From Swiss-Prot:
Consists of an N-terminal FAD-binding domain with a Rossman fold, a substrate-binding domain and a C-terminal helix that bridges the 2 domains close to the antibiotic-binding site. This last helix is flexible, is not found in TetX of Bacteroides species, and may contribute to their different substrate specificities. FAD binds at A12, G13, V14, A15, E34, K35, Q44, R105, Y267, D289. It comes from Legionella longbeachae serogroup 1 (strain NSW150). It catalyses: a tetracycline + NADPH + O2 + H(+) = a (1S,10aS)-3-(CONH2)-1-(Me2N)-3,3a,4,6-(HO)4-2,5-dioxo-1H,10aH,11H,11aH-cyclopenta[b]anthracene + CO + NADP(+) + H2O; 7-chlorotetracycline + NADPH + O2 + H(+) = (1S,10S,10aS)-3-(CONH2)-9-Cl-1-(Me2N)-3,3a,4,10-(HO)4-10-Me-2,5-dioxo-1H,10aH,11H,11aH-cyclopenta[b]anthracen-6-olate + CO + NADP(+) + H2O. Its cofactor is FAD. This is Flavin-dependent monooxygenase. The gene is tet(56). Pfam families: FAD_binding_3.
Length: 389
């Protein structure tokens, strides 16, 4: 197989543009598609930490990430009446240390997309069929076009359509960790400035913060529940579930929920892990949350995406496009790092959403444990060195 192979990358989140960057840098010809009409703005706050900060520097984007980072200066735990129980400096409140940075998902994707300006990118594009044989992969697009590629890399997230198309149901597991997460923006009606407020009790958590844009506040909800929605993707069912769950929670909860209809960036999902014995099948590979989501609560999905993208592209380079050899190495090199991060994801899920209100002692003990564990886990892989073409 010639090195300059044609590779279709699906998904313009974090992992998709990241793997396109490294593929292009290593001499391949990637093409990126995204089902949405444009880059989604805002979104959850993501951390760039550990080994991912090294990769970001290698990509030349670390300084840009720092410039666009969130700037929460203080975090406060409050009770149901709004009384402050405990206050922490913003970086510790977000479990960050050293050169680690928090940035909104949309801002990070925008930075990544600028690094691949020379890569063909097609929005509002999705796939209805994929078939592979010994020579190539035939892809049928929603608009009826039929194209052939040497390889396909799916970076289309935790609910990956490509994973469902290619892998049998017994080849992957979506493990619900017994909790849900929702975020959305609303007007900054409390007049918050670079501060994050959280109320956590009865296995539920409500937060609201505002930093770079003083007009906007970002609300967050987390809660434990074994209830499974009839349709996890139905936004109206999600919102009603949220209202029912937090009906009597107190604090600012009802004021936030009353403003929820004003939001245009509502996000809701089960806190879930994706587990697989192999992230590749034939000529198709999964990268990021599509293959190994550690859970949104872990704060590590972004870092796994950076590391996975780098190793997948690098191994294809070393193998000179021999995908069988490269995919075998990709699975082997990443396995222990993924396993450690997924174990951490379970531990974090069990450590949050406590029964009682968060006292100073509980908050500090939890912060110190997480800071110690995450430093080790986020640096728990030695990256191979791949020479650029």
């Amino acid at each position: 197989m010639s090195k300059n192979i044609k590779i279709l990358v699906i998904g313009a989140g974090v992992a998709g543009p990241a793997v396109c960057y490294w593929l292009r840098r290593f001499g391949f010809s990637p093409v990126l598609i995204e089902k949405y009409a444009s880059i989604r703005k805002g979104g959850q706050a993501l951390d760039v930490r550990g080994i991912a900060t090294h990769i970001a520097r290698e990509m030349g984007i670390y300084d840009q990430i720092c410039e666009m980072r969130t700037r929460i200066e203080r975090g406060r735990f409050v009770d149901s009446s709004g009384k402050v129980l405990h206050e922490e400096q913003g970086e510790k409140f977000g479990f960050r240390q050293d050169d680690e940075v928090e940035i909104l998902r949309g801002d990070l994707v925008e930075i990544l997309m600028k690094t691949i300006a020379d890569v063909p990118c097609y929005f509002n594009q999705s796939i209805i069929s994929i078939e592979q044989n010994a020579d190539n992969v035939t892809v049928i697009f929603m608009d009826g076009r039929i194209e052939q590629y040497d390889l396909v890399i799916a970076a289309d997230g935790i609910h990956s359509a490509i994973r469902r198309m290619i892998f049998e149901k017994n080849e992957y597991q979506l493990i619900h960790l017994g909790a849900y997460l929702s975020t959305f923006t609303i007007p900054n009606y409390l007049g918050l400035s670079h501060i994050d407020l959280e109320c956590e009790a009865n296995n539920k958590l409500v937060s609201i913060n505002s930093d770079n844009n003083p007009e906007i506040a970002r609300a967050g909800f987390m809660f434990r529940s074994q209830h499974l929605l009839n349709d996890i993707r139905d936004e109206q069912e999600q919102k009603q579930f949220l209202r029912d769950t937090f009906r009597d929670f107190g604090w600012e909860t009802q004021n936030i929920l009353n403003r929820m209809p004003e939001s245009n960036d509502f996000y809701f999902d089960a806190i879930t892990q994706v587990k697989m014995n192999s992230w590749t099948k034939g000529r198709i590979a999964l990268v990021g949350d599509a293959g190994y989501c550690p859970s949104p609560l872990s704060g590590q999905g972004n870092n796994l995406a950076f590391v996975g993208a780098y190793i997948l592209a690098g191994e294809l380079k070393v193998a000179n496009g021999n995908y069988t050899r490269a995919f075998t190495r990709y699975n082997a090199l990443l396995r222990s790092f993924v396993d450690a991060n997924q174990k951490f994801g379970v531990w974090v899920s069990e450590s949050f959403l406590v029964k009682d209100e968060v006292s100073k002692e509980i908050a500090e003990e939890r912060s110190n444990k997480i800071l110690a564990m995450i430093k080790s886990i986020s640096n728990g892989i030695t990256l191979p060195q791949y020479e650029s073409s």
